[in-house]
Swiss-Prot record:
TM helices/strands, residue ranges: 51-71, 88-108, 120-140, 160-180, 208-228, 276-296, 309-329
Gene3D superfamilies attached to this UniProt entry: Rhodopsin 7-helix transmembrane proteins
UniProt-listed InterPro entries: GPCR_Rhodpsn, GPCR_Rhodpsn_7TM, Oxytocn_rcpt, Vasoprsn_rcpt
Protein name: Mesotocin receptor
Annotated GO CC locations: plasma membrane
Sugar-bearing residue positions: N15, N20, N27, N31
Lineage start: Eukaryota, Metazoa, Chordata, Craniata, Vertebrata
Superkingdom per UniProt: Eukaryota
GO molecular function terms listed in the Swiss-Prot or TrEMBL record: oxytocin receptor activity; peptide binding; vasopressin receptor activity
Extracellular side: 1-50, 109-119, 181-207, 297-308
Entry comment describing in which tissues the protein is expressed: Highly expressed in the bladder. Also expressed in kidney, brain and skeletal muscle.
Protein species of origin: Rhinella marina
Amino acid sequence: MEGLCLNLDCSELPNSSWVNSSMENQNHSSNSTRDPLKRNEEVAKVEVTVLALILFLALAGNICVLLGIYINRHKHSRMYFFMKHLSIADLVVAIFQVLPQLIWDITFRFYAPDLVCRLVTYLQVVGMFASTYMLLLMSLDRCLAICQPLRSLHRRSDCVYVLFTWILSFLLSTPQTVIFSLTEVGNGVYDCRADFIQPWGPKAYITWITLAVYIIPVMILSVCYGLISYKIWQNIRLKTVCESNLRLSTSRRATLSRVSSVRLISKAKIRTVKMTFIIVLAYIVCWTPFFFVQMWSVWDPNPPKEASLFIIAMLLGSLNSCCNPWIYMLFTGHLFHDLLQSFLCCSARYLKTQQQGSDLSASRKSNSSTFVLSRKSSSQKSITQPSTA
């Protein structure tokens, strides 16, 4: 996540060189004993291995979810619509954030033109914004579905909201193209690094990214799930009152109908609320260490220099892109089941077609051989038959 380590020289993580290119002069004394052109290869190998595993799980999981939604009969529901776009956002994170970081860790330096450097760091943050805001949109939808169910029954312009989320993600990521560039870090050695003109630049930008991607979304998510929890508590309380009145009511049928309707509202939506809550919890767990370390490194006059701390925080942030699809599978098991059934059905159909093709080919060969033998037999019979003339 070179493009995410805005204040740090992430390409030098393995050898604990954590000073931003714009801050090297004021911190030169603390780095004088380090060689910025070398790294700890053992730590780099571990990081490459973990990133490769995260990339595989993220690609496999999100592709399975998208295929499962495609073949599922409920794919036009609002929840599946948001799940689809959150999976697409996670794929963007995997392809344009985790994969470039993996290649970067393998090569150690950025071996590409300046334009590619700016584009890669830009797309790295696009995926992070899109994934966060798509999760926020999904949670707001669940909040409306629980707190205002009559309003949520009307089909809203979901495509407009999703399109706005993507456009906003692309726009908010544009500063990356200005901040990052191909910079000389040694004698003839170039790397893709951040460069701030003003000394307060890293603090301002890191704080802005943390607010836009983490703090403000988490605050909104907390309000959403606070309202959802309160509404569910009210729902359970009403259900309990109705069930107690059922024993005393003279109009048992009307009360039973009321109890059933309350239970229906709860059962229809509680599962999706649980799923989105677990996704939000995974997001907070994965990204909290990363943003904490980012803010610590720019606001503390004596930031930590331990490479392992920053590497773990970075890898945890990347891990979020492969968590979501497996959470989907856990709460909507029929997605995986439908995908597996479709795969088995297609495989059986393919094998059956192949078998029919081979049987037809064998039948044609058999008929051809029979025809040749009969022709040969008839010709021999005509030769051996005596002439009547």
